[in-house]
């Protein structure tokens, strides 16, 4: 039997800061179901960032995610044998998910490149996103550049 409405996501807030956003991020960086290790990594990185800047760790994290969150993306649309990249607005939930994934991916890339610990790389990536630079912010800028380049096809919206 079909649902009338889409089921709401039930993400509980994290234990230390009471933030649903931070728990979503912990779930993204978690590997092989080891949530306690993912929590240690996230909390350690946030406490290092808090010491470095001097502001509340949760506000630093929320600002970093906000700076990396895209508002537009391109989707492929096939019309008459040709495929066009059509810029469309993103739902808020998907935009935040993209931002969190980009921060995690940039952290992983920095860790492989530099050989430093995950905590240090995550802390530096959060601070980079907070200061509007770094790998995750670069991914966000690439989304905007693609949308800007394909602005002519915006009339082909879904």
Curated annotation (Swiss-Prot):
SUPFAM superfamilies registered for this protein in UniProt: Ribosomal protein S7 (SSF47973)
PANTHER family: RIBOSOMAL PROTEIN S7
Pfam families in the record: Ribosomal_S7
Physiological role: One of the primary rRNA binding proteins, it binds directly to 16S rRNA where it nucleates assembly of the head domain of the 30S subunit. Is located at the subunit interface close to the decoding center, probably blocks exit of the E-site tRNA.
Subunit structure: Part of the 30S ribosomal subunit. Contacts proteins S9 and S11.
InterPro entries membership: Ribosomal_uS7 (IPR000235), Ribosomal_uS7_bac/org-type (IPR005717), Ribosomal_uS7_dom (IPR023798), Ribosomal_uS7_dom_sf (IPR036823)
GO cellular component, one term: small ribosomal subunit
CDD domains associated with the record: uS7_Bacteria (cd14869)
Protein name per UniProt: Small ribosomal subunit protein uS7
Keyword Ribosomal protein attributed: yes
Top-rank taxon: Bacteria
GO molecular function annotation: rRNA binding; structural constituent of ribosome; tRNA binding
GO BP annotations, alphabetical order: translation
NCBIfam families in the record: rpsG_bact (TIGR01029)
